[in-house]
Amino acid sequence: MNKIIIYTDGGCRGNPGIGGWGVWLKYGDYDKKLQGVQQDTTNNQMELTATIKALEVIKSNDIAIDLFTDSKYVITGISEWIKNWKAKGWKTANKKPVKNIDLWQRLDVLNNQHNVTWHWVKGHSGDKGNDMADALANLAMDKIST
Protein backbone atom coordinates (compact mmCIF):
# COMPACT_ATOMS: atom_id res chain seq x y z
CA MET A 1 0.00 0.00 0.00
CA ASN A 2 1.36 3.39 -0.95
CA LYS A 3 1.58 6.17 1.59
CA ILE A 4 1.61 9.91 1.31
CA ILE A 5 4.52 11.38 3.23
CA ILE A 6 4.02 14.93 4.49
CA TYR A 7 6.41 17.27 6.27
CA THR A 8 5.04 20.51 7.70
CA ASP A 9 6.56 23.48 9.46
CA GLY A 10 5.48 26.90 10.59
CA GLY A 11 7.41 29.84 11.89
CA CYS A 12 7.04 33.41 12.98
CA ARG A 13 9.29 36.46 13.05
CA GLY A 14 8.08 38.01 16.23
CA ASN A 15 5.40 36.19 18.19
CA PRO A 16 3.00 37.59 17.13
CA GLY A 17 4.48 38.85 13.90
CA ILE A 18 4.96 37.85 10.28
CA GLY A 19 4.46 34.12 9.97
CA GLY A 20 5.00 31.54 7.30
CA TRP A 21 4.21 27.89 6.76
CA GLY A 22 5.68 25.24 4.49
CA VAL A 23 4.59 21.79 3.37
CA TRP A 24 6.42 19.09 1.43
CA LEU A 25 4.27 16.19 0.21
CA LYS A 26 5.64 13.04 -1.38
CA TYR A 27 3.68 10.24 -3.00
CA GLY A 28 5.85 7.78 -4.87
CA ASP A 29 7.84 9.81 -7.42
CA TYR A 30 5.47 12.78 -7.12
CA ASP A 31 6.22 15.65 -4.81
CA LYS A 32 4.49 18.95 -4.15
CA LYS A 33 5.64 22.00 -2.23
CA LEU A 34 3.24 24.48 -0.62
CA GLN A 35 3.87 27.65 1.32
CA GLY A 36 2.07 30.67 2.64
CA VAL A 37 2.51 33.78 4.72
CA GLN A 38 0.36 35.75 7.14
CA GLN A 39 0.70 39.04 8.99
CA ASP A 40 0.14 39.35 12.75
CA THR A 41 0.12 35.65 13.60
CA THR A 42 1.85 33.27 16.00
CA ASN A 43 4.20 30.35 15.60
CA ASN A 44 1.54 27.91 16.83
CA GLN A 45 -1.01 29.27 14.35
CA MET A 46 1.46 28.74 11.52
CA GLU A 47 2.27 25.19 12.67
CA LEU A 48 -1.45 24.38 12.69
CA THR A 49 -2.03 26.12 9.35
CA ALA A 50 0.73 24.06 7.71
CA THR A 51 -0.89 20.78 8.76
CA ILE A 52 -4.34 22.00 7.68
CA LYS A 53 -3.12 23.15 4.25
CA ALA A 54 -1.33 19.83 3.75
CA LEU A 55 -4.39 17.73 4.54
CA GLU A 56 -6.71 19.98 2.51
CA VAL A 57 -4.91 19.11 -0.74
CA ILE A 58 -5.28 15.35 -0.23
CA LYS A 59 -8.34 14.36 -2.25
CA SER A 60 -8.43 10.64 -1.44
CA ASN A 61 -9.57 9.50 1.98
CA ASP A 62 -8.32 5.92 1.62
CA ILE A 63 -4.56 6.48 1.30
CA ALA A 64 -2.49 6.25 4.47
CA ILE A 65 -0.69 9.45 5.41
CA ASP A 66 2.48 9.79 7.48
CA LEU A 67 2.62 13.40 8.66
CA PHE A 68 5.83 14.71 10.23
CA THR A 69 6.03 17.94 12.22
CA ASP A 70 8.51 19.43 14.64
CA SER A 71 5.67 20.99 16.65
CA LYS A 72 5.02 19.24 19.94
CA TYR A 73 2.04 21.61 20.28
CA VAL A 74 0.42 20.07 17.18
CA ILE A 75 1.39 16.48 18.01
CA THR A 76 0.21 16.63 21.63
CA GLY A 77 -2.88 18.63 20.72
CA ILE A 78 -4.12 16.27 18.02
CA SER A 79 -3.21 13.04 19.83
CA GLU A 80 -4.03 13.89 23.45
CA TRP A 81 -5.61 17.24 24.28
CA ILE A 82 -8.28 17.38 21.58
CA LYS A 83 -10.37 14.53 23.01
CA ASN A 84 -10.72 16.34 26.34
CA TRP A 85 -11.30 19.72 24.70
CA LYS A 86 -14.18 18.32 22.68
CA ALA A 87 -15.66 16.52 25.70
CA LYS A 88 -15.54 19.80 27.65
CA GLY A 89 -17.12 21.92 24.90
CA TRP A 90 -13.76 23.14 23.56
CA LYS A 91 -12.53 24.26 26.97
CA THR A 92 -9.16 23.53 28.54
CA ALA A 93 -8.66 21.73 31.85
CA ASN A 94 -8.76 25.21 33.43
CA LYS A 95 -12.19 25.81 31.84
CA LYS A 96 -10.78 28.46 29.51
CA PRO A 97 -11.54 28.56 25.77
CA VAL A 98 -9.05 26.61 23.66
CA LYS A 99 -6.61 28.94 21.90
CA ASN A 100 -6.72 28.75 18.10
CA ILE A 101 -10.06 26.94 18.32
CA ASP A 102 -10.94 27.64 14.67
CA LEU A 103 -7.72 25.98 13.51
CA TRP A 104 -8.06 23.04 15.90
CA GLN A 105 -11.64 22.41 14.80
CA ARG A 106 -10.63 22.45 11.12
CA LEU A 107 -7.70 20.13 11.80
CA ASP A 108 -9.97 17.79 13.75
CA VAL A 109 -12.35 17.48 10.77
CA LEU A 110 -9.48 16.80 8.37
CA ASN A 111 -7.82 14.33 10.73
CA ASN A 112 -11.08 12.38 10.96
CA GLN A 113 -11.47 12.38 7.15
CA HIS A 114 -8.02 10.90 6.56
CA ASN A 115 -5.95 7.99 7.82
CA VAL A 116 -3.16 10.06 9.40
CA THR A 117 -0.29 8.73 11.47
CA TRP A 118 1.33 11.64 13.30
CA HIS A 119 5.10 11.78 13.84
CA TRP A 120 7.22 14.24 15.76
CA VAL A 121 10.63 15.05 14.28
CA LYS A 122 13.27 17.17 15.97
CA GLY A 123 13.58 20.50 14.18
CA HIS A 124 16.91 21.60 12.70
CA SER A 125 18.33 18.10 13.16
CA GLY A 126 19.25 17.42 9.54
CA ASP A 127 16.00 15.64 8.63
CA LYS A 128 15.63 16.32 4.89
CA GLY A 129 11.85 16.63 4.93
CA ASN A 130 11.74 18.90 7.97
CA ASP A 131 14.51 21.05 6.51
CA MET A 132 12.53 21.41 3.27
CA ALA A 133 9.32 22.43 5.09
CA ASP A 134 11.30 24.88 7.24
CA ALA A 135 12.95 26.40 4.15
CA LEU A 136 9.55 26.84 2.47
CA ALA A 137 8.14 28.59 5.56
CA ASN A 138 11.15 30.91 5.68
CA LEU A 139 10.94 31.68 1.96
CA ALA A 140 7.30 32.65 2.44
CA MET A 141 8.24 35.01 5.28
CA ASP A 142 11.09 36.46 3.20
CA LYS A 143 8.60 37.51 0.51
CA ILE A 144 6.68 39.76 2.88
CA SER A 145 9.50 41.06 5.06
CA THR A 146 11.67 42.38 2.23
Swiss-Prot record:
Mg(2+) 2 binds at residues 9, 134. GO terms for biological process: DNA replication, removal of RNA primer. It is found in: Cytoplasm. Its main location: cytoplasm. Endonuclease that specifically degrades the RNA of RNA-DNA hybrids. Belongs to the RNase H family. This is Ribonuclease H. It comes from Ruthia magnifica subsp. Calyptogena magnifica. The gene is rnhA.
